[in-house]
A protein has these predicted regions:
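Right-hand nucleic-acid polymerase module
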Residues: 1-165, 175-306
C-alpha cells in the first residue's frame, strides 16, 4: 500500500453531519456538474468490523476547519468512552457496534421497569443508575456461587417524564446464567421482560438501535455503561485500495468515489469486489454543496457458511 506523504495531517470533523443531503434528491446532470467543479481532495475509507457486521464509510479529509462544511465542524470521536450520554449520535453508533461485537443470540436482553414504590425521583438519573449497579452486584454474587465469572453487559438507562413508564433500563448481558435467576436479581418491579437475543440480517443492530434511539431529545435522557473487558469494534482507515480484494495496483480512494457516487448499484458492485466474503446489505450516498464533495456509507454482513 502506498504510504501517505509526510505532513499530511488531517483534522477530525463530523463528516456524517457535514454530508447529510441524499444523492437520491438530485438528478444525474447536477451530480455530474457538482463532481466536475468540486476541488481535488483526499478521501479516506474507514472499515468497521463488529461481530458479523461490517460497515464502510468513505469521506473527504481536510487540513483546515474552514474547508469543512459548517454542519460538520463539531469534533467528535467515534469511540469516546467518556461520552456516556446517548444524545450524541456517535455514542449511539459506538454502543450499537459494541453490542454486535460482544454478544450473540445465546445472550440476554433484559428490560426492567419500576413499580410506584421504587420509582427514582423525577430527573435523578444517577439514582436510577445506582439501582442497575445494585442489580449487577446481585447477578455477580449469584454467578460466583455457580462458579461463573462476572457478567459481561451493556446497559442503557432511559428517562422520559412524558411517558407512562418514565424510567426503564435495557440490559444486554451474556447468557451464561439461567434467565429466571437473572430476573430475580431485579427488586424494583415485577413488570419486566427477559428474552434471548435474536439476530436478523443486520445482526443485533436493530435491537441496539431500538434501545439507544431518542424519541424526545429535549425532555428525555439516556445514559449507557458497560462491563470491563468488552472487545472494541475493529476500526481501520486507509487512503488507497486495490480494485478487487487480491488483484490490481493500489489506487486512491477518490478514484473509486468517481464511480460510486453515480448510484447505489455502483456502490454495491465495488463493495462486493473489495469484500467478497461479505453480503451487501445497504448503502447511502450523500453530498454537500458547500464544497461539492461526497460521503458514502455501506453496510455488509459476514456470509453465512452453507
Amino acid at each position: 500500500m502506498a504510504k501517505r506523504k509526510k505532513g499530511m495531517t488531517f483534522i477530525p470533523y463530523d463528516y456524517e453531519a457535514a454530508y447529510n443531503k441524499s444523492l437520491e434528491d438530485m438528478n444525474e446532470f447536477f451530480v455530474e456538474q457538482m463532481f466536475k467543479h468540486g476541488k481535488k481532495v483526499v478521501y479516506a475509507l474507514k472499515e468497521i468490523r463488529a461481530g458479523d457486521q461490517f460497515e464502510v464509510e468513505i469521506y473527504p479529509q481536510f487540513k483546515k476547519m474552514d474547508e469543512v462544511p459548517p454542519e460538520g465542524r463539531s469534533i467528535k470521536k467515534d469511540n469516546d468512552k467518556a461520552q456516556r450520554n446517548l444524545n450524541d449520535k456517535n455514542a449511539r453508533k459506538y454502543v450499537e457496534r459494541l453490542i454486535n461485537e460482544n454478544f450473540t443470540d445465546r445472550d440476554l436482553w433484559l428490560t426492567f421497569t419500576y413499580d410506584n414504590e421504587h420509582l427514582p425521583p423525577d430527573g435523578d438519573i444517577d439514582a436510577a443508575i445506582k439501582n442497575v449497579q445494585k442489580f449487577i452486584r446481585r447477578v455477580n454474587y449469584q454467578r460466583k456461587k455457580r462458579g461463573l465469572p462476572n457478567a459481561r453487559y451493556v446497559y442503557v438507562t432511559a428517562y422520559n417524564p412524558t411517558e407512562e413508564i418514565r424510567w426503564h433500563h435495557h440490559i444486554v448481558m451474556d447468557g451464561d446464567m439461567d434467565m429466571d435467576v437473572v430476573e430475580g436479581c431485579w427488586k424494583q418491579s415485577s413488570r419486566n421482560e427477559v428474552r434471548r437475543l435474536q439476530k436478523d440480517e443486520n445482526g443485533l443492530t436493530g435491537m441496539a438501535k431500538y434501545i439507544v434511539e431518542e424519541k424526545n431529545r429535549v425532555k428525555s435522557e439516556k445514559r449507557w455503561n458497560s462491563s470491563q473487558g468488552l472487545r472494541d469494534p475493529d476500526i481501520k482507515v486507509v487512503h488507497s485500495k486495490r480494485p478487487t480484494a487480491k488483484a490490481g495496483g493500489y489506487k486512491k480512494i477518490g478514484t473509486y468515489v468517481e464511480t460510486m457516487r453515480k448510484g447505489h448499484e455502483q456502490v454495491r458492485e465495488q463493495m462486493l469486489e473489495w469484500y467478497p466474503d461479505f453480503d451487501f446489505t445497504d448503502a447511502g450516498i450523500y453530498y454537500n454543496d458547500f464544497n461539492s464533495m461526497f460521503y458514502i456509507r455501506a453496510r455488509m454482513r459476514k456470509r453465512r457458511q452453507q
